[in-house]
């Protein structure tokens, strides 16, 4: 099992439209990725230890069986999915692929 984590850093002047993201963008992502997408979790950053601000305003974890399954599902739709990002944020997302160990 792998997780593709999409992270939106908390930055000065950053904006994020949660209504569009949750009601339009994420349903589109789910539809495009189809059965290859095993689960998805979205989190809103609320803070860090010591009362500091969250490092990321939002993170999305998308779960797939393996990297080839992700690449096969995402590849044909990458331009459309990533092209939708400016409709809900001016923050450049950071993406990382993690392998589940435990």
Descriptions of predicted regions:
Residues 1-102:
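Macromolecular interaction modules
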């Amino acid at each position: 099992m792998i997780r593709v984590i999409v992270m939106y850093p908390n930055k000065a002047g950053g904006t994020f439209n949660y209504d569009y993201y949750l009601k339009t963008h994420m349903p589109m992502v789910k539809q495009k990725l189809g059965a290859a997408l095993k689960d998805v979790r979205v989190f809103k950053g609320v803070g860090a230890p010591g009362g500091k601000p969250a490092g990321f305003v939002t993170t999305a974890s998308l779960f797939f069986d393996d990297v080839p399954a992700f690449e096969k599902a995402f590849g044909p739709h990458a331009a459309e999915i990533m092209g939708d990002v400016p409709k809900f944020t001016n923050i450049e997302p950071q993406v990382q692929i993690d392998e589940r160990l435990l």
